[in-house]
């Protein structure tokens, strides 16, 4: 596998708003939300995918709690933050992401960053960067690598660390076994496949099986890089979704409640795509009359949510929210609110949709029709 820029290269360092002007896609650096199906809260990341987290109640729209910059487990249970108020020590805190309460706090000598976490939240990766080397800590195990490595993700048991190896001629993906300390190249299911692109968004399955990353190719085409976190084998899923870097970077990636389906929704490119994760192939493409690509808002990333039964998908763009019927492949007419949308989430009943606005009170829509409630 050659010339892949993985998702966590974009997420290792929290991006300030000024980074958006330097070419960071809205999905990685803009304000966006996630809402596990059936959850009572919506998570809004206000400074990129490793930025501060705000949790909102899906029934009232009220903010429940706020957490500092850190990493959130895919199942929505655990949040780990790191801060170095002193140059010589780092304070680390593990939170229950469902309540915002502290589970544990501790400190380490040196300056460490929390950069990855397993889907269950059981294990997390810490890195300490030096001029010539990078130190890793995962579940009590340590390793030291040249400074040309970045962390991409973790296997469910925390034994393997998936890495990006930077070279003068580009970069490749490798994996480190923390027990044997063996470093090997990440294998591709098709050895002859060559993928070139830049990561613009990613999502991990809540069962710890897949890390699914959307890549933008230099020619405007795109593909999904599906990394099996259990076996370490990578797969490529070619897409018919085409557009420039920022348009593709406004694609929302959402998983079905049973983790068997990945939905890609992009109102700027006018597409909703369905991928069967069992077959690793696109099974449906639906068109919609969406927004102009000239109006991509780099400060506001894409948000999406599914009802607990997986029937309705809500996705956003600027001030508009659309509802997609996953059973019939129908996109409902978009509903507009007064200001930019920063998050969406369905109530556990699946009958109402909470819409969070950047400037303004929360709105509630009927989950079937999109009408205001």
Question: Model regions: which residues?
Answer:
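Repeated scaffold domains used in trafficking and secretory/extracellular systems
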Residues: 26-35, 66-77, 109-120, 147-157, ...
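Structural core positions within WD40/WD-like beta-propeller blades
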Residues: 41-43, 79-80, 125-126, 162, ...
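Short glycine/acidic-enriched loop and turn motifs that connect beta-strands
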Residues: 47-50, 84-89, 130-133, 166-170, ...
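Short coil/turn segments that connect the beta-strands within blades of beta-propeller domains
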Residues: 38-40, 76-77, 122-123, 157-159, ...
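An edge-strand/N-cap motif at the start of beta-rich repeat modules
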Residues: 21-65, 72, 76-77
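Bacterial N-terminal signal peptides
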Residues: 6-16
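Short loop/turn segments that connect beta-strands within beta-propeller blades
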Residues: 58-61, 96-100, 137-141, 177-181, ...
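Beta-propeller fold detector
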Residues: 64-69, 103-108, 142-149, 183-190, ...
């Amino acid at each position: 596998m050659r010339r892949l820029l993985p998702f966590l290269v974009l997420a290792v360092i929290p991006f300030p708003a000024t980074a958006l002007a330097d070419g960071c896609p809205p999905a990685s650096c803009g304000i966006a939300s996630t809402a596990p199906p059936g959850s009572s809260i919506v998570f809004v990341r206000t400074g990129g995918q490793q930025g501060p987290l705000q949790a909102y109640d899906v029934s009232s729209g009220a903010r429940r709690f706020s957490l500092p910059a850190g990493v959130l487990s895919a199942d929505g249970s655990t949040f780990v933050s790191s801060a170095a108020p002193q140059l010589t020590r780092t304070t680390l805190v593990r939170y229950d992401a469902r309540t915002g309460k502290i589970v544990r706090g501790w400190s380490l000598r040196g300056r460490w960053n929390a950069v990855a976490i397993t889907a269950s939240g059981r294990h997390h990766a810490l890195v300490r960067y030096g001029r010539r080397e990078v130190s890793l800590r995962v579940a009590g195990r340590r390793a030291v690598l040249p400074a040309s490595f970045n962390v991409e993700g973790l296997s469910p048991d925390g034994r393997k660390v998936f890495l990006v190896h930077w070279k003068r001629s580009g970069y490749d993906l490798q994996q480190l076994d923390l027990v044997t300390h063996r470093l090997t190249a990440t294998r591709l299911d098709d050895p002859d496949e060559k993928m070139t692109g830049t990561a613009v968004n990613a999502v991990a399955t809540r069962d710890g099986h897949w890390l699914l990353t959307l890549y933008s190719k230099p020619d405007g085409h795109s593909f999904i890089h599906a990394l099996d976190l259990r076996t370490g084998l990578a797969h490529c899923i070619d897409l018919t979704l085409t557009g420039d870097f920022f348009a593709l970077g406004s694609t929302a990636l959402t998983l079905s409640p049973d983790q068997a389906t990945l939905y890609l929704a992009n109102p700027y490119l006018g597409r909703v795509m369905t991928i069967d994760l069992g077959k690793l192939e696109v099974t449906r493409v639906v068109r919609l009359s969406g927004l102009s690509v000239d109006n991509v808002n780099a400060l506001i990333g894409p948000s999406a949510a599914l009802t607990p039964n997986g029937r309705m998908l809500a996705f956003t763009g600027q001030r508009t929210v659309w509802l997609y019927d996953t059973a019939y492949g129908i996109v409902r007419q978009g509903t507009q609110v007064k200001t930019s949308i920063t998050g969406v989430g369905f109530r556990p009943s699946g009958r109402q949709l909470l819409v969070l606005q950047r400037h303004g009170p929360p709105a509630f829509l009927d989950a079937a029709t999109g009408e205001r409630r």
